[in-house]
Amino acid sequence: MEINNRVAIGMSGGVDSSVAAYLLKKQGFDVIGLTMRVWVDHEAKAFDSDKSCCSLKATQDAKKVAEILGIPHYTVDLSKIFYDKIVNYFVNEYLKGRTPNPCVLCNRQIKFGELLEKAFELGAYYIATGHYVRKEYDEKTKRYLLKKGIDSSKDQSYVLYRLTQKQLEHALFPLGNYKKEEIRALAEELKLPVAKKPESQEICFIPDNDYSGLIKRQVKDEIKPGEFRDVHGKFLGYHKGIIHYTIGQRRGLGLSSDRPLYVVDIDVKNNVVVVGHQEDVWGEELISSNNNFISIEKLEKEMKVTAKIRYTAKEEEAIIKPYEEDKVLVKFLKPQRAITPGQSVVFYDKDVVVGGGIIERKLK
């Protein structure tokens, strides 16, 4: 496909993507607005919440903004493929005792996968989003780089670490050099109807934030009560089913103890939730699998990086090195709290994303 100036922007009906669309138009791009229709749990209590990025109101808001900006707008029904690839993954990970981040998978497979294909069909060379990240091309390595947004409080590079070189080639991130308050101020200046809209905090397909409720509705009979045991194997009581627990969790265990108890492991095979004290929750080493690298083609030798083990975590110094098959051994210089299988660990070299992978297990 020849490079052209047509760009399709994913519009969620929120402030960020709305202003991103305006900025692209101002820069001279031929802009098309696309809003994804994804599968949403209709039985969730807050299904029609205006805060949800998947509500009918959100789609109407996106259309309104597109009209104001004078750009065409289309709704793309991706509900079936979203359910098959994202919702099923989310549910199955919890059934395996893991805690997934569905946004990471959605960005690679849906937003920069299915939606990018739709952009191509509409004659666009680029797909854009309202993520707070930057993209650069490194002439030396001939690779596209993903860099943190300049607003450190809003940087979203963690959820985009799985993007491929082809996806990055076609990606535009208009907000990477802005701070959030500048974007909201611009929305107000433009008198966009979404200027004061609050940010969506929940996972888009679970508007009431009730993960276990969603999972129960999908799998029904597969969730069985089991035993709580301590780190020495001593029986402490019964749990409601492993989907209700994640590593580091303290609330909702229903166990009495002279010291606070935390989930430290989930033994799926035996349907046991292992609990321990605060010191049992910390670890320094982990194995990541299903890794994706951006600034380098492949990890071939030991490398010093900073890394974080969840979206809200602080980056910490670590050493990464190749492990058996295509896995990576990550050794942090300081202990990390609640290394959680299923979450992503993302590696950085200053403000550049080196890559990352899915946490398979804590080593020690």
Curated annotation (Swiss-Prot):
Positions of disulphide bridges: 106-204
CDD domains (UniProt xref): MnmA_TRMU-like
Signal peptide: none
Pfam families: tRNA_Me_trans, tRNA_Me_trans_C, tRNA_Me_trans_M
Matches recorded under Gene3D superfamilies: Adenine nucleotide alpha hydrolases-like domains, HUPs, Translation factors
Site (Interaction with tRNA): residue numbering on this chain: 131, 343
Keywords: ATP-binding, Cytoplasm, Disulfide bond, Nucleotide-binding, RNA-binding, Transferase, tRNA processing, tRNA-binding
Catalytic activity: S-sulfanyl-L-cysteinyl-[protein] + uridine(34) in tRNA + AH2 + ATP = 2-thiouridine(34) in tRNA + L-cysteinyl-[protein] + A + AMP + diphosphate + H(+)
Subcellular location: Cytoplasm
Residues annotated for ATP binding in this entry: 10-17, 36, 130
Record GO biological process: tRNA wobble position uridine thiolation
Region spans: Interaction with tRNA: 154-156, 310-311
EC number(s) stated in the UniProt entry for this protein: 2.8.1.13
Catalytic residues identified in the record: 106, 204
Entry's Gene Ontology molecular function annotations: ATP binding; tRNA binding; tRNA-uridine 2-sulfurtransferase activity
Family assignment from sequence similarity: Belongs to the MnmA/TRMU family.
HAMAP family with a match to the protein in the record: tRNA_thiouridyl_MnmA
Full protein name: tRNA-specific 2-thiouridylase MnmA 2
Lineage: Bacteria, Bacillati, Bacillota, Clostridia, Thermoanaerobacterales
